[in-house]
A protein has these predicted regions:
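Conserved ABC ATPase "signature" region
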Residues: 110-128
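Helix-to-loop junction immediately C-terminal to a conserved catalytic motif
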Residues: 49
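ABC ATPase NBD coupling module
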Residues: 65-85, 109-110, 129-130
Length: 136
């Protein structure tokens, strides 16, 4: 599997914060971008995982374009981003954190709860289901 970003550009008004970044990552590779503050490293990753929509450029998983896929669709395909900061809402429980993400999908409330239950079981989180993030 190959994840590829081609000529990614991100503009906020007149300010171009990412200027034509291209990157290719093969399955199993670990990638980090080095550069000074404000160079567009985080924004580039955000575009690839779907947190930020690129102004232009394309993102592919293998040969399938995923530029317009929502973040949860990319996650279903195995694309994720581990932030430098804590990635859970610390005052919410494990279950509430999972439900928070599932609320971004097109699933009904009942389907969200079923999916949450499945994920908790799949990752063996039953014993910490009601624990707050800051207590894990």
């Amino acid at each position: 599997m190959i994840l590829r970003g081609e000529n990614l550009i991100k503009e906020y008004g007149p300010k171009k914060v990412v200027k034509g970044v291209s990157v290719q990552v093969e399955q199993g590779e670990i990638v980090g971008l080095l550069g000074p503050n404000g160079a567009g490293k985080t924004t580039s990753f955000y575009m690839i995982v779907g947190l930020v929509k690129p102004t232009s450029g394309k993102i592919f998983l293998d040969k399938q374009e995923i530029t317009n896929d929502a973040m949860y669709r990319r996650a279903q395909k195995g694309i994720g981003y581990l932030a430098q900061e804590a990635s859970v809402f610390r005052k919410l429980s494990v279950e509430e954190n999972i439900m928070g993400v599932l609320q971004l999908t097109n699933l009904s409330r009942r389907e969200q709860q079923i999916k949450c239950d499945e994920l908790i079981e799949e990752f063996s989180l039953q014993h910490v289901r009601k624990n707050r993030g800051d207590l894990l």
